[in-house]
Amino acid sequence: MFRLSFASIAARLAFAGALLASAAAQAASCPVHYLDGRPPEIQNQKLAVSTRELCYGVFGVVHSGVTRTPLWSAEYVRADNLKRAQGLDRDDKFHAESRLPRGQRAELADYARSGFDRGHLAPNANMPDRRTQRESFSLANMVPQDRDHNRKIWAPIEGAVRTMAKKEGELYVITGPAFLGTSRKKVGNVIVPTHLYKVVSSPRQRLGAAWLTENRADAPINVVPVAELERIVGIELLPSLSTKQKERMLRLPTVKPSKKRS
């Protein structure tokens, strides 16, 4: 019979404990941005390769060195911060994220003459002061986004979230790209997402729901349960809610695409 010595068992338990401690430490890096302090959990392990957590003032990012984009950006959106944000003029200072290795991050040159916008995940318009506004212009908070999608579809969705937050007082929001299908398009070294999603959860109602759209100009705006979106993207986005809660739908405003010219 195969037997492990006490020392061997102790060593294995210590190693497992170290792994758990490491995971817990990473999960707790910026818990304030997540519902109940619990960040999303990656189920599709292909997505977990070369990921790093980055904490900012009013949002947090988990960045992929493979796609050179965020996997998600998380915000605790408060009505008082949005009121402060209304008094700020936009100051466009896009920059590469110095905390990321050069071989895993997006550079300004990747987007140059690409025809794609540098699309914010955590919106600049949610930032309450100059410091957080500058943080939002890090390329670690950006994905390559169809220009008309950004202006005509995504901007109205972001506005709807702000309207909700002012009524609710507070919301937790997770915004991310999806890379569905087998073909991959790049701008420079950055992979272009096929879809974008925005999950909104209410701590008061203990419910969430999500907008999901293709990354193209004429994409329909879909509203889906969190449970369905989790299956699509391979990430448990709201791990502190039960399956039943995630199958129910938080009521989201109807969003119509803007007809303004780009």
What do the PLM-derived regions correspond to, one by one?
Residues S8-G17:
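Sec-dependent N-terminal signal peptides
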